Amino acid sequence: MASKPDFDPNDPLDYSANLDYLNELVRAEPELYGIYKKDENGNELKDANGNRILDEEGDYSGYFRDIQWKNKAITELYYPGSVFKVITSAMGVDSGLANINTTFTCAGAYGVAKETYHCAGHKAHGTITLAEALRQSCNIYYIQLGQRVGSQTFYNYFDAFGITSRTGVDLPSETGFMQYYKANQLGEVQLASSAFGQAMAITPLQMCTAVAAAVNGGYLVTPHVVDKITDTNGNVVEEIGTNIRRQVISESTSDVIRQMMEYEVGNGTGGGKNAYVSGYRIGGKSGTSEQLNMHRRADGDYKKVASFVAVLPANDPEILVYVMLDDPNNARTDYSSILAAPVAGNIISEVAPYLGIATDGEDRSGTIVTVPNLVGTEWSNAQVQLNIQ
Protein backbone atom coordinates (compact mmCIF):
# COMPACT_ATOMS: atom_id res chain seq x y z
CA MET A 1 0.00 0.00 0.00
CA ALA A 2 1.75 3.11 -1.26
CA SER A 3 -0.17 5.36 1.12
CA LYS A 4 0.70 3.15 4.12
CA PRO A 5 4.28 1.87 3.58
CA ASP A 6 4.54 0.64 7.18
CA PHE A 7 1.40 -1.50 6.97
CA ASP A 8 2.01 -5.19 7.76
CA PRO A 9 -0.73 -7.45 6.28
CA ASN A 10 0.22 -10.14 8.81
CA ASP A 11 -0.46 -7.76 11.68
CA PRO A 12 -3.70 -6.06 10.67
CA LEU A 13 -4.86 -2.87 12.25
CA ASP A 14 -8.32 -2.21 13.60
CA TYR A 15 -10.33 0.95 13.26
CA SER A 16 -12.84 2.77 15.40
CA ALA A 17 -15.68 4.07 13.27
CA ASN A 18 -17.88 6.89 14.45
CA LEU A 19 -20.97 4.90 13.40
CA ASP A 20 -19.89 1.40 14.40
CA TYR A 21 -23.17 0.26 15.92
CA LEU A 22 -25.52 0.84 12.97
CA ASN A 23 -25.69 -2.84 12.04
CA GLU A 24 -26.82 -3.77 15.55
CA LEU A 25 -29.37 -0.96 15.64
CA VAL A 26 -30.91 -1.71 12.26
CA ARG A 27 -31.35 -5.40 13.02
CA ALA A 28 -32.98 -4.57 16.35
CA GLU A 29 -35.56 -2.23 14.85
CA PRO A 30 -35.82 -2.74 11.07
CA GLU A 31 -39.16 -0.94 10.88
CA LEU A 32 -37.47 2.24 12.11
CA TYR A 33 -35.19 2.26 9.08
CA GLY A 34 -37.51 0.75 6.49
CA ILE A 35 -35.54 -2.47 5.97
CA TYR A 36 -37.72 -4.90 4.01
CA LYS A 37 -37.29 -8.34 2.48
CA LYS A 38 -36.35 -8.40 -1.19
CA ASP A 39 -36.11 -11.02 -3.92
CA GLU A 40 -32.94 -11.87 -5.84
CA ASN A 41 -33.57 -8.95 -8.20
CA GLY A 42 -33.82 -6.43 -5.39
CA ASN A 43 -37.60 -6.07 -5.55
CA GLU A 44 -39.42 -5.74 -2.24
CA LEU A 45 -41.54 -8.75 -1.30
CA LYS A 46 -45.12 -8.36 -0.10
CA ASP A 47 -47.49 -10.50 1.90
CA ALA A 48 -50.95 -11.66 0.82
CA ASN A 49 -52.41 -8.28 1.75
CA GLY A 50 -49.92 -6.33 -0.34
CA ASN A 51 -47.88 -5.11 2.64
CA ARG A 52 -44.09 -5.03 2.62
CA ILE A 53 -42.41 -7.64 4.84
CA LEU A 54 -39.91 -6.44 7.44
CA ASP A 55 -36.58 -8.25 7.29
CA GLU A 56 -35.72 -8.93 10.92
CA GLU A 57 -33.02 -11.54 10.29
CA GLY A 58 -31.07 -10.10 7.38
CA ASP A 59 -27.33 -9.51 7.26
CA TYR A 60 -26.78 -5.77 7.22
CA SER A 61 -22.99 -5.89 7.45
CA GLY A 62 -22.75 -4.13 4.10
CA TYR A 63 -26.08 -2.35 4.07
CA PHE A 64 -24.71 1.13 4.61
CA ARG A 65 -21.72 0.50 2.36
CA ASP A 66 -22.88 -1.08 -0.84
CA ILE A 67 -26.52 -0.36 -1.64
CA GLN A 68 -26.13 -0.12 -5.40
CA TRP A 69 -22.44 0.61 -4.66
CA LYS A 70 -23.36 4.25 -4.34
CA ASN A 71 -23.26 6.56 -1.34
CA LYS A 72 -25.98 9.03 -2.22
CA ALA A 73 -24.94 11.40 0.55
CA ILE A 74 -21.85 12.33 -1.47
CA THR A 75 -22.54 11.22 -5.04
CA GLU A 76 -25.99 12.63 -5.79
CA LEU A 77 -27.21 16.21 -5.94
CA TYR A 78 -30.51 17.64 -4.72
CA TYR A 79 -32.22 20.93 -3.99
CA PRO A 80 -31.94 21.45 -0.21
CA GLY A 81 -35.12 23.51 0.04
CA SER A 82 -35.98 25.25 3.29
CA VAL A 83 -33.20 23.60 5.30
CA PHE A 84 -30.99 26.11 3.50
CA LYS A 85 -32.84 28.93 5.28
CA VAL A 86 -30.55 28.18 8.23
CA ILE A 87 -27.64 29.31 6.06
CA THR A 88 -29.43 32.37 4.67
CA SER A 89 -30.26 33.35 8.26
CA ALA A 90 -26.59 33.06 9.20
CA MET A 91 -25.64 35.23 6.22
CA GLY A 92 -28.04 37.98 7.27
CA VAL A 93 -27.06 37.99 10.94
CA ASP A 94 -23.30 37.64 10.45
CA SER A 95 -23.17 40.39 7.82
CA GLY A 96 -24.95 42.75 10.20
CA LEU A 97 -27.79 43.21 7.73
CA ALA A 98 -30.35 41.46 9.94
CA ASN A 99 -30.90 40.25 13.48
CA ILE A 100 -33.29 37.89 15.19
CA ASN A 101 -35.96 40.62 15.38
CA THR A 102 -35.64 41.98 11.83
CA THR A 103 -39.07 42.06 10.19
CA PHE A 104 -40.38 41.65 6.65
CA THR A 105 -43.97 41.33 5.50
CA CYS A 106 -45.38 38.25 3.78
CA ALA A 107 -48.67 38.79 1.96
CA GLY A 108 -48.74 35.26 0.55
CA ALA A 109 -47.37 36.25 -2.87
CA TYR A 110 -44.29 38.19 -3.91
CA GLY A 111 -43.18 39.29 -7.36
CA VAL A 112 -39.58 39.22 -8.53
CA ALA A 113 -39.02 40.28 -12.15
CA LYS A 114 -41.55 38.19 -14.08
CA GLU A 115 -41.84 35.49 -11.42
CA THR A 116 -44.37 35.28 -8.58
CA TYR A 117 -43.36 33.38 -5.45
CA HIS A 118 -45.61 31.92 -2.76
CA CYS A 119 -45.31 30.30 0.61
CA ALA A 120 -46.61 26.78 1.15
CA GLY A 121 -50.37 26.71 0.65
CA HIS A 122 -50.20 30.36 -0.48
CA LYS A 123 -50.32 31.26 3.20
CA ALA A 124 -49.79 34.91 4.21
CA HIS A 125 -47.64 35.13 7.35
CA GLY A 126 -47.98 38.88 7.82
CA THR A 127 -45.17 40.93 9.34
CA ILE A 128 -42.84 38.53 11.14
CA THR A 129 -39.36 38.44 12.65
CA LEU A 130 -36.43 36.33 11.46
CA ALA A 131 -37.02 33.81 14.26
CA GLU A 132 -40.68 33.42 13.28
CA ALA A 133 -39.78 33.26 9.59
CA LEU A 134 -37.51 30.28 10.20
CA ARG A 135 -40.10 28.61 12.41
CA GLN A 136 -42.90 29.14 9.88
CA SER A 137 -40.56 28.55 6.92
CA CYS A 138 -41.67 31.69 5.11
CA ASN A 139 -40.28 31.76 1.56
CA ILE A 140 -41.25 35.37 0.99
CA TYR A 141 -39.41 36.55 4.10
CA TYR A 142 -36.24 34.83 2.93
CA ILE A 143 -36.51 36.24 -0.58
CA GLN A 144 -36.54 39.72 0.93
CA LEU A 145 -33.67 38.84 3.26
CA GLY A 146 -31.70 37.56 0.26
CA GLN A 147 -32.36 40.81 -1.57
CA ARG A 148 -31.03 42.77 1.39
CA VAL A 149 -27.92 40.59 1.61
CA GLY A 150 -27.26 41.00 -2.12
CA SER A 151 -25.69 38.76 -4.75
CA GLN A 152 -22.02 39.29 -3.90
CA THR A 153 -22.35 38.85 -0.14
CA PHE A 154 -24.69 35.89 -0.63
CA TYR A 155 -22.13 34.14 -2.84
CA ASN A 156 -19.23 34.98 -0.53
CA TYR A 157 -20.96 33.22 2.37
CA PHE A 158 -22.19 30.40 0.11
CA ASP A 159 -18.57 29.72 -0.84
CA ALA A 160 -17.29 30.15 2.72
CA PHE A 161 -19.76 27.53 3.98
CA GLY A 162 -18.01 25.04 1.69
CA ILE A 163 -20.87 24.49 -0.74
CA THR A 164 -18.80 25.24 -3.86
CA SER A 165 -16.27 22.45 -3.17
CA ARG A 166 -16.08 18.86 -1.98
CA THR A 167 -16.33 18.29 1.76
CA GLY A 168 -13.14 16.19 1.76
CA VAL A 169 -14.77 13.27 3.58
CA ASP A 170 -12.64 10.10 3.66
CA LEU A 171 -14.98 8.18 1.35
CA PRO A 172 -14.57 7.45 -2.37
CA SER A 173 -16.40 9.03 -5.30
CA GLU A 174 -17.51 12.32 -3.73
CA THR A 175 -18.85 14.42 -6.58
CA GLY A 176 -17.42 17.80 -7.41
CA PHE A 177 -20.07 18.77 -9.93
CA MET A 178 -22.34 20.92 -7.79
CA GLN A 179 -24.69 23.30 -9.57
CA TYR A 180 -25.00 26.86 -8.29
CA TYR A 181 -24.88 30.47 -9.40
CA LYS A 182 -21.74 32.56 -8.96
CA ALA A 183 -22.08 36.15 -7.83
CA ASN A 184 -22.20 37.56 -11.36
CA GLN A 185 -24.88 34.99 -12.29
CA LEU A 186 -27.18 35.74 -9.36
CA GLY A 187 -29.81 37.85 -11.03
CA GLU A 188 -33.03 38.86 -9.30
CA VAL A 189 -34.79 35.53 -9.83
CA GLN A 190 -31.72 33.38 -9.18
CA LEU A 191 -31.03 35.18 -5.90
CA ALA A 192 -34.67 34.94 -4.84
CA SER A 193 -34.81 31.18 -5.45
CA SER A 194 -31.39 30.59 -3.90
CA ALA A 195 -32.39 32.37 -0.68
CA PHE A 196 -34.82 29.58 0.22
CA GLY A 197 -32.80 26.68 -1.19
CA GLN A 198 -34.44 25.94 -4.53
CA ALA A 199 -31.75 27.07 -6.99
CA MET A 200 -28.61 25.16 -6.04
CA ALA A 201 -27.94 21.45 -6.50
CA ILE A 202 -25.61 20.16 -3.79
CA THR A 203 -24.94 16.93 -1.91
CA PRO A 204 -26.64 16.06 1.38
CA LEU A 205 -23.26 15.95 3.13
CA GLN A 206 -22.48 19.48 1.96
CA MET A 207 -25.72 20.62 3.56
CA CYS A 208 -24.74 18.80 6.75
CA THR A 209 -21.30 20.39 6.97
CA ALA A 210 -22.78 23.83 6.29
CA VAL A 211 -25.41 23.47 9.03
CA ALA A 212 -22.76 22.07 11.37
CA ALA A 213 -20.67 25.19 10.78
CA ALA A 214 -23.70 27.36 11.47
CA VAL A 215 -24.24 25.81 14.92
CA ASN A 216 -20.79 24.74 16.16
CA GLY A 217 -19.45 28.24 16.68
CA GLY A 218 -19.00 29.00 13.01
CA TYR A 219 -16.28 26.52 11.99
CA LEU A 220 -16.33 24.57 8.73
CA VAL A 221 -14.98 21.11 9.55
CA THR A 222 -13.92 18.25 7.27
CA PRO A 223 -16.12 15.21 8.08
CA HIS A 224 -14.53 11.81 8.75
CA VAL A 225 -15.88 8.27 9.06
CA VAL A 226 -12.87 6.75 10.80
CA ASP A 227 -12.00 8.18 14.20
CA LYS A 228 -8.76 6.30 14.88
CA ILE A 229 -6.71 3.24 13.89
CA THR A 230 -5.29 0.83 16.49
CA ASP A 231 -2.94 -2.16 16.36
CA THR A 232 -3.65 -5.63 17.74
CA ASN A 233 -2.57 -4.50 21.21
CA GLY A 234 -5.02 -1.63 21.24
CA ASN A 235 -2.38 1.04 20.77
CA VAL A 236 -3.47 4.03 18.72
CA VAL A 237 -1.49 4.05 15.47
CA GLU A 238 -3.26 6.96 13.87
CA GLU A 239 -5.87 9.37 15.16
CA ILE A 240 -7.71 11.36 12.54
CA GLY A 241 -8.58 14.32 14.72
CA THR A 242 -10.58 17.40 13.78
CA ASN A 243 -9.65 19.35 10.67
CA ILE A 244 -11.04 22.90 10.83
CA ARG A 245 -10.98 24.42 7.36
CA ARG A 246 -11.95 27.96 8.39
CA GLN A 247 -14.27 30.05 10.52
CA VAL A 248 -17.27 31.09 8.45
CA ILE A 249 -19.37 33.08 10.93
CA SER A 250 -18.80 34.51 14.39
CA GLU A 251 -19.49 32.67 17.65
CA SER A 252 -22.25 35.17 18.42
CA THR A 253 -23.97 34.57 15.07
CA SER A 254 -23.76 30.83 15.64
CA ASP A 255 -25.40 31.29 19.04
CA VAL A 256 -28.31 33.11 17.38
CA ILE A 257 -28.74 30.29 14.84
CA ARG A 258 -28.80 27.69 17.62
CA GLN A 259 -31.49 29.64 19.45
CA MET A 260 -33.59 29.93 16.31
CA MET A 261 -33.29 26.23 15.49
CA GLU A 262 -34.28 25.27 19.03
CA TYR A 263 -37.25 27.62 18.73
CA GLU A 264 -38.21 25.68 15.59
CA VAL A 265 -38.51 22.41 17.52
CA GLY A 266 -39.84 24.20 20.58
CA ASN A 267 -40.05 21.39 23.14
CA GLY A 268 -42.78 19.73 21.15
CA THR A 269 -44.65 22.90 20.21
CA GLY A 270 -42.75 24.48 17.29
CA GLY A 271 -42.80 23.88 13.55
CA GLY A 272 -40.38 20.98 13.97
CA LYS A 273 -42.21 19.55 16.98
CA ASN A 274 -42.35 16.06 15.49
CA ALA A 275 -38.58 15.76 15.95
CA TYR A 276 -38.78 16.49 19.67
CA VAL A 277 -37.64 13.82 22.13
CA SER A 278 -38.40 14.38 25.80
CA GLY A 279 -35.34 15.14 27.89
CA TYR A 280 -33.23 16.63 25.11
CA ARG A 281 -32.70 20.15 23.82
CA ILE A 282 -33.07 19.78 20.06
CA GLY A 283 -32.72 22.29 17.27
CA GLY A 284 -34.00 21.62 13.78
CA LYS A 285 -35.26 22.79 10.42
CA SER A 286 -37.51 21.15 7.87
CA GLY A 287 -37.22 21.36 4.11
CA THR A 288 -39.45 20.36 1.21
CA SER A 289 -38.03 20.77 -2.27
CA GLU A 290 -38.71 19.64 -5.81
CA GLN A 291 -36.72 16.72 -7.17
CA LEU A 292 -33.71 17.68 -9.24
CA ASN A 293 -34.99 15.80 -12.29
CA MET A 294 -38.31 17.70 -12.11
CA HIS A 295 -40.37 14.56 -12.69
CA ARG A 296 -44.10 14.89 -12.11
CA ARG A 297 -46.44 12.76 -10.02
CA ALA A 298 -49.79 11.40 -11.10
CA ASP A 299 -51.51 14.52 -9.71
CA GLY A 300 -49.39 16.74 -11.97
CA ASP A 301 -47.29 18.27 -9.21
CA TYR A 302 -43.53 17.79 -9.11
CA LYS A 303 -42.10 14.91 -7.10
CA LYS A 304 -40.69 16.13 -3.81
CA VAL A 305 -37.80 15.58 -1.43
CA ALA A 306 -38.76 15.89 2.25
CA SER A 307 -35.87 16.55 4.63
CA PHE A 308 -35.17 17.50 8.22
CA VAL A 309 -31.95 18.47 9.97
CA ALA A 310 -31.65 18.19 13.75
CA VAL A 311 -28.82 19.10 16.12
CA LEU A 312 -28.44 18.32 19.81
CA PRO A 313 -27.95 19.42 22.46
CA ALA A 314 -29.19 22.65 20.94
CA ASN A 315 -27.09 24.84 23.23
CA ASP A 316 -23.84 22.96 22.49
CA PRO A 317 -24.37 20.49 19.60
CA GLU A 318 -22.54 17.17 19.59
CA ILE A 319 -24.43 15.36 16.85
CA LEU A 320 -26.30 16.28 13.70
CA VAL A 321 -29.03 14.11 12.19
CA TYR A 322 -30.12 14.68 8.60
CA VAL A 323 -33.08 12.79 7.16
CA MET A 324 -34.00 12.87 3.47
CA LEU A 325 -37.04 11.15 1.97
CA ASP A 326 -36.84 11.05 -1.82
CA ASP A 327 -40.34 11.16 -3.34
CA PRO A 328 -42.12 9.97 -0.17
CA ASN A 329 -45.15 7.89 -1.02
CA ASN A 330 -47.72 9.77 1.04
CA ALA A 331 -50.95 10.88 -0.57
CA ARG A 332 -51.93 13.19 2.29
CA THR A 333 -49.03 15.61 2.58
CA ASP A 334 -45.67 16.76 1.25
CA TYR A 335 -44.71 18.52 4.47
CA SER A 336 -41.32 17.39 5.73
CA SER A 337 -42.29 18.45 9.25
CA ILE A 338 -44.80 15.60 9.15
CA LEU A 339 -42.84 13.10 7.05
CA ALA A 340 -39.13 13.55 7.82
CA ALA A 341 -39.14 15.16 11.29
CA PRO A 342 -40.58 12.08 13.05
CA VAL A 343 -37.82 9.93 11.53
CA ALA A 344 -35.22 12.34 12.91
CA GLY A 345 -36.87 12.15 16.31
CA ASN A 346 -36.88 8.36 16.23
CA ILE A 347 -33.19 8.27 15.35
CA ILE A 348 -32.38 10.72 18.15
CA SER A 349 -34.33 8.62 20.66
CA GLU A 350 -32.01 5.68 19.86
CA VAL A 351 -28.69 7.38 19.14
CA ALA A 352 -28.59 10.00 21.91
CA PRO A 353 -28.71 7.53 24.84
CA TYR A 354 -26.23 5.23 23.09
CA LEU A 355 -23.71 8.05 22.64
CA GLY A 356 -24.34 9.41 26.12
CA ILE A 357 -25.61 12.79 24.95
CA ALA A 358 -26.48 14.95 27.94
CA THR A 359 -30.14 15.54 28.68
CA ASP A 360 -31.60 18.92 29.57
CA GLY A 361 -30.82 18.27 33.24
CA GLU A 362 -34.40 18.15 34.45
CA ASP A 363 -34.93 15.40 37.01
CA ARG A 364 -37.89 13.31 35.86
CA SER A 365 -37.43 10.45 38.30
CA GLY A 366 -40.68 9.58 40.00
CA THR A 367 -42.67 11.52 37.44
CA ILE A 368 -45.97 9.91 36.52
CA VAL A 369 -46.60 10.01 32.79
CA THR A 370 -50.01 9.32 31.31
CA VAL A 371 -49.48 7.28 28.15
CA PRO A 372 -51.97 8.28 25.45
CA ASN A 373 -54.27 5.71 23.90
CA LEU A 374 -52.52 4.93 20.62
CA VAL A 375 -54.57 1.92 19.59
CA GLY A 376 -55.24 2.15 15.87
CA THR A 377 -52.66 4.92 15.38
CA GLU A 378 -50.10 4.61 12.59
CA TRP A 379 -46.75 3.43 13.93
CA SER A 380 -44.88 6.62 12.95
CA ASN A 381 -47.46 8.88 14.58
CA ALA A 382 -47.50 6.75 17.72
CA GLN A 383 -43.71 6.98 17.96
CA VAL A 384 -43.87 10.79 17.77
CA GLN A 385 -46.39 10.93 20.60
CA LEU A 386 -44.28 8.62 22.78
CA ASN A 387 -41.10 10.64 22.12
CA ILE A 388 -42.78 13.73 23.55
CA GLN A 389 -43.73 12.02 26.83
Residue spans of the language-model regions?
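Beta-lactam-recognizing serine transpeptidase/beta-lactamase-like catalytic domain environment
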Residues: M1-S82, I87-L325
